[in-house]
Amino acid sequence: IQTAHEAFQITRKVPSWKRTEVLEKVSEGIKANREKFARAIALEAGKPIQSARAEVDRAVFTFKIASEEARRIYGEIVPLDWLPGNENRIAHIRRVPRGPVIGITPFNYPLNLVAHKVAPAIAAGNPIIVRPATQTPVSSFLLAQVVLEAGWTPGGMQVVPTKTSDAKPFV
């Protein structure tokens, strides 16, 4: 958790164009290692290879969509004319990274459900700690390697495989 807080001091300052670039590289990295990911999923989750490949393809898409959304984290302009004398006042709301995120995932989609936690966290500029299912941690480790190679901050994605009882302090 301390490492994630330290990484947050960096990730919170990463501009949206850079987060977009990292997410695109993650998408490309997963696609380039499609068979490696599919074999890992098939072996650790017991899925047929075709289903595992479909899951990898979905994760590629998830990171691609997140790369596009990283550009669209807008703020809002809110009128403050609720009281007399405030007719010409407005508030500007800016969306900013909040801090480390914990992603706890089940075993049935060991890559795609992790991707659905990691991609939005990166898009928003937050570090993430992933606690994968004890039965299926390998694809999370493979993904963490791709994320690091894509240029995300060291410590910005961590994988902590633990028993459920040991994960309670994270919650």
What are these regions (language model features)?
Residues I1-Y74:
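Glycine-rich loop-to-alpha-helix module at the N-terminal edge of alpha/beta enzyme cores
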Residues G75-V171:
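Rossmann-like NAD(P) dinucleotide-binding subdomain of oxidoreductase/dehydrogenase enzymes
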